Amino acid sequence: MPSFDIVSEVDLHEVRNAVENAQRELTTRWDFRNVEASFELNEKTESVKTTSVSEFQVQQLLDILREKMAKRGIDGAVLNIPEEMTHSGKTYSVEATLKQGIDTPLAKKIVKMIKDSKLKVQAQIQGEQVRVTGKSRDDLQAVMKLVREGELGQPFQFTNFRD
């Protein structure tokens, strides 16, 4: 029976390239001349820290980062940006974490969404991924479309397609 896995993974190498490109753009931007602003990627905690001297500039930095990530083929929804900024001394900073894997509540929501669609497929949670099995390829492709169109706040990839 045909099956595939729904996963949510981020290529850290591409994220590193996007952060380096964003840092490079900072040196050429006129509005960031003579301003202490930076991007820092922490691969162990899978987070990107943006730092600048004002809240507005931190928001601009996040926009630059999203733009560079989009150019590298990474969806901007992988960034989990906190509501409040950290303010210490004269700098503002935001540490945005990268969403890796599908957590259990979201996986349950995906399985429920698939079951509510009345397609003839079975969905089961396997760790940080969801396995979908069905008799027809068309049903599996309908599930892919359903998950892509569902407003779940996280980008998904479909891997391990077996026939």
From Swiss-Prot:
Cellular component terms (Gene Ontology): cytosol
Keyword Nucleotide-binding set for record: yes
Any GO molecular function: nucleotide binding
Family matches, as InterPro entries: DUF520, UPF0234-like_C, UPF0234_N, YajQ-like_sf
SUPFAM superfamilies assigned to the protein according to its UniProt record, in alphabetical order: YajQ-like
Domain of life: Bacteria
Record Pfam families: DUF520
Keywords associated with the record: Nucleotide-binding
Family: Belongs to the YajQ family.
Role summary: Nucleotide-binding protein.
NCBIfam families the UniProt entry points to: PRK05412.1
Record protein name field: Nucleotide-binding protein PMI0103
Species whose genome carries this gene: Proteus mirabilis (strain HI4320)
Lineage: Bacteria, Pseudomonadati, Pseudomonadota, Gammaproteobacteria, Enterobacterales
